[in-house]
Amino acid sequence: MSVQQVCDAYSELRTRVADLMRSITTEQALAVVPHCPQWTVKDCLAHMIGVPEDAINGQMDGVATDAWTDRQVQRHKPDSVSDLLAAWEANAPVFANILPKIPQPVLSQFMFDQTTHEHDIRAALGKPGARESIAIAVSEGFICDSLSRNSDPAI
């Protein structure tokens, strides 16, 4: 996938997830995410928003660790879904300028993570969809590329 295709996939995913989150109740936002049982739907969204926030603010110490991810979730605990979506929207133009500068394979890995969490949220809400999206194609490409670069037959 080209950098532009990955950036387009993220923009589409962000819009799709925001639309989905606007359609849910407060109770649904507190539903446990089956594949991330320590998180609620709102916590998962907080992480999805927290990664771009951290990139924008240069908060990359411990990137991709549990501690880094937990900081994203914890700082948004008091926020409502509406607050989270407003923050995501406010940061979108700045992150759109950063996103194409992220080198591969990190760019596609970011997209893989975002796509995974979109579908984590969808599973928790019982609202499947977006399985034919460009985000899925980017994620599949990331997995295939990762496997082809890794010579370990156990992986």
Question: How would you label these PLM feature ranges?
Answer:
Residues 40-41, 80:
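Short, structural beta-strand-to-alpha-helix junction motif
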Residues 2-35, 41-46, 50:
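N-terminal "assembly arms/tails" that initiate or stabilize quaternary assembly
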Residues 74-91, 98-103:
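A short, structured beta-strand-centered segment in the mid-to-C-terminal lobe
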Residues 41-68:
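Conserved alpha-helical segments that form or flank metal/cofactor-binding pockets of metalloenzymes
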Residues 21-25, 52-59, 125:
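A generic secondary-structure signal for well-formed alpha-helical elements
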Residues 18, 45, 85, 89, ...:
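Non-transmembrane alpha-helical segments in soluble domains
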